[in-house]
Amino acid sequence: MTRTRKEELVAEMTAEFKDAGAIIVCDYKGMTVENLETVRNLAKDEDTKVKVVKNRLAMIALQNAGCEAVDFKDTNLVIWGDTQVLPCKIADKAATQFKDHFTIKTGLIQGEVASMETINAMAKLPTRDELIGMLLNVWNAPVQNFTIGLQALADKKESEA
């Protein structure tokens, strides 16, 4: 890779890391290409990005983005996205699906290093769309119960008549 290409890559990652809600660093040692593609497809479905990057370039991009320092060693796969929950969910799903070869090393939430407990807890949270669905169900329940009651009352009066 040429120096100019490395600089372009760092600039691109810096811009994306600045806007990222969460950045998860994972170890993928021993994974097959098919398994990596599965992880990439999980991320693509959720509008999240996955990239295997050189350690030094990733460190420079994180520093330029104003994030806390992360020590990159061995093989690293970086998962990031605009939201805080989705990258955590994807990393957790991949870690459970490929237990032997995929582990979450560390993560950054809003540019600050997060503990593994935080990352695991965020992976268990519902997504924005799921939360909206839950809220709509809560709002819909009283109206639905009211209409069921009215229908039962109408049926009762009809049977009496």
Curated annotation (Swiss-Prot):
A Pfam family hit: Ribosomal_L10
Family, per entry: Belongs to the universal ribosomal protein uL10 family.
Known function: Forms part of the ribosomal stalk, playing a central role in the interaction of the ribosome with GTP-bound translation factors.
InterPro entries: Ribosomal_uL10 (IPR001790), Ribosomal_uL10-like_sf (IPR043141), Ribosomal_uL10_bac (IPR022973), Ribosomal_uL10_bac_type (IPR047865)
Keyword S-adenosyl-L-methionine in annotation: no
Range of residues in the leader sequence: none
Record-level GO cellular component terms: ribonucleoprotein complex; ribosome
Single Gene Ontology BP annotation: translation
Keywords: Ribonucleoprotein, Ribosomal protein, RNA-binding, rRNA-binding
Entry GO MF terms: large ribosomal subunit rRNA binding
Protein name (database record): Large ribosomal subunit protein uL10
Entries under SUPFAM superfamilies matching the protein: Ribosomal protein L10-like (SSF160369)
UniProt subunit comment: Part of the ribosomal stalk of the 50S ribosomal subunit. The N-terminus interacts with L11 and the large rRNA to form the base of the stalk. The C-terminus forms an elongated spine to which L12 dimers bind in a sequential fashion forming a multimeric L10(L12)X complex.
Organism of derivation: Sulfurovum sp. (strain NBC37-1)
